[in-house]
Amino acid sequence: MMTEWLGLPALAATHGGQIDNLIGWIHVFMLILFVGWGGFFVYTLIRFRKSRHPVANYTGVTSSASKYSEIAVAVIEAVLLVGFAIPIWAARVDRVPPESEALVVQVTAEQFAWNVRYAGPDGVFGRTDITMIDAQANPLGLDRSDPAAKDDVTTLNQLYLPVNKPIIVKLRAKDVIHSFGVPEFRVKQDAIPGFTIPVYFVPDVTTAEMRTRTGNPEFQYEIACAQLCGLGHYRMRGFVTVQTAEEFQTWMDAEQETLKGEAGGSDIFR
């Protein structure tokens, strides 16, 4: 009800309910303030109109009501911050599960694309070398001669995830500040050059299920860059496909077969 009333996107991550609850309470508080202060403003316009008070009163307010109301507002804001916002943020930052229990994905932002990399079956990300970066063929500078890199899977603007699996996105940027945001996951985090920032969430609705829920057969989870990053910012879009564990494994196996074919037909791994 609250989600629909506020116009929030459909929820598709386990932690999103807490965030939606916080957003709802903030809006309730804002509504109370709006009605309260708006009513008080109208009251003062009528109560102290010129026809009733032709001579200015220089004494000022003698009641303590305004002081107590301001204290009450400050207390409520503190409760929202300490009781809701900080615990939710701590859960996102301090309670990230061990990487052994999650799917770890590297997402590197650049003008104007999202470069996605999976470690492959060995669970180890291969070596990268900035001298090997090629804007078209190798945007990450992945060194395929490194044994750990032979099974690394890379995609452009496409993030594939298994449902109900803890996900840790290691977010980086090659050039300027970008911002990784997926509204349905209630996730948004700046990508800053020189930093690797972990983003943790658990998607709990597959893309197919969301298409059924929304009645939109073309629905896709979209990665939107929420930070103005240059002239091409408007086209920096990526997409997330949430699959069942079996579907994700089938996709990963197909990618591994493709890598083996490329290794046999070229010197990409030599």
Regions found by a protein language model. Give the residues of each.
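Non-transmembrane, membrane-proximal soluble domains of secreted or membrane proteins
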Residues: 2-23, 45-270
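Central hydrophobic cores of alpha-helical transmembrane segments in multi-pass inner-membrane proteins
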Residues: 36-44
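Alpha-helical transmembrane segments
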Residues: 23-36
